[in-house]
Amino acid sequence: MKKESIYLILAFFILCAHSLYANKSVRLSSPNGKIKFSLVLDKNSPVYSVAFNKQTLIQDSPLTLTFDNGAFGENVKINKPVFSTKEETYELIVGKAKHIHSLSKEVIIPLEETVQPFRKINLVVRAFDDGIAFRYEFPKQKGWDSYIMYDEGTSFNLQGNPSVTTLFLPNYQSSHEGKYTVTDYADMDNKRLMDMPALFSFPNHVYMAITEAAVRDYAGMYLWKENGALLGKLSPKLGQERIKVEASLPHQSPWRVLMISDQIGSLIASNILTNLNEPCKIEDTSWIKPGKTTFTWWNGNVVPDTTFLGGNNFPTNKYYIDFVARNGLDYHSIYGNAEQAWYDEDGAGFGSPGPKADILKVVPSLNMQEICDYAKSQGVRIHLWTNWKPLYAKIDEAFAQFEKWGIAGMMIDFMDRDDQEMIRIQEEFLAKAAKHHLFVQFHGACKPSGLNRTYPNEFTREGTLNYEHCKWDKDTDADHDIHMPFTRLLAGATDYHLGGFRSLPRDKFKNQERNPYVMSTRCHMLAMYVVLESYLGMICDTPEAYEGQPGFEFLKAVPTTWDQTVVPNAVSYTHLTLPTKLEG
């Protein structure tokens, strides 16, 4: 009788456990207990909620995925979840801090269809003290070894009508350069593409930013409001609109990240995106040297008070190499001159290389080996601007030649996409560049996603409306700048074309291609080198604008990487105090 009772009790607990997972909820809390995640089945469909300090931010948000063999998200059961604690310490060569301690709680929630085709997908959730992240895992399984995804229906049912700060985009092919809009969520237009990160300010001074981490072999995600609901939208494969992702199993999505805090400065200092990425793939990183660089395109390749004409020639580059050397800077960039690249582009301009463009065919007026040898003799390294298309066409030959010349890195430009193919291409650039000891600076590119941990040769990305616009419009001013730390910078480094030393107030400001003006003050410009995360700081004005001028000594001394970043004082779009720290 006693033995039978034990069996009955065990059977009862097993039944209760199955019922708990199949019909009730799975819950996860951050290590400090402030952030809570829950997943339940609503009519056999998974929905999730997120709360911070008992304040609900996201409520009953559906998770559905649409594939070529049907939608996944209805007639689903929850199998037994697996809970664990994740803790690690690691170092970043380029990042917001050098020494990182990451602590999170994780649950793997197996979701399985109860009707044919009986597919299985895992929802992996991690809770940090500064946010929640989740991703979809697609394990290889009988009868399902590959997929074509039409839509990822991740949704975010916001509560409390938060204020939203976002960048609206006209379409998926974009340089991600524009003015940010601040509005209440209820008043925000439907069916407009929203870039990420987007910031949501809730009542009681609670802040949440939505972005993504570890975007690899997948399409980039955007936000989209429709019928009041906030949805994720994937960038479609080029030339059509339906297919978003194609993959063989096993496969996984990027992390969908909700950065959360009651101190907005904590979002700026957060390392959650690098925490969610794989460790460094580069065995020897001793050659990776962040630093500061010229960028003569911005100033118009100006060479005042010289006996030679500025252009695609040795004297012009020597002029700037000598400037870098005598001021203890690091890099000189070569892009070309006017609208002509340093290589044969066979096209109408930088953004439109022709079919016969050849990255290995240097224009006759330049001897790249001579320039690199001279730079080396002065303790200066060279990095090259390139359009991504001719570079990718000869990626292996080009990188080998660059290494032979002694090139340190590249600015890769005009990608303007983040569909799955372009995401793959960007990672291929990083991986192959590392084999040839080359750093990468992406321009005309999508937001970062913490991949600088895996590939620390990624120094910075553009993807912001920045000071290059001072050459043709009046959009980049201090009011625009102060939005950056609370929006795009939450995702990581940005190249902002810093360094303009010729300032004019807005009422006197004028656009000009050569020796352009900026609308910010000198002090504002200097502060941007500390506030804006970038591991390749531009010194983009002319030697004449800098040498002997107040503030240039600071530019020469300011680091491009820090050992610690804290934000003790910040008010959205008004001000912030960011005392970074460098060991020693």
Where are these regions (language model features)?
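Glycine-rich, acidic and aromatic/proline-enriched surface loops and short helix-turn segments
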Residues: 296-300, 322-331, 338-339, 371, ...
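An acidic-aromatic substrate-binding cleft motif
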Residues: 251-320, 327
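Glycine-rich, aromatic-lined ligand/substrate-binding cores of catalytic
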Residues: 509-572
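N-terminal accessory beta-strand-rich subdomains and adjacent acidic, glycine-rich linkers
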Residues: 25-281
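Aromatic- and carboxylate-enriched substrate-binding clefts and catalytic-loop regions
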Residues: 336-517, 521
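Bacterial Sec-dependent N-terminal signal peptides
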Residues: 1-24
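Conserved small/polar residues in nucleotide/adenosyl-binding loops
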Residues: 574-580
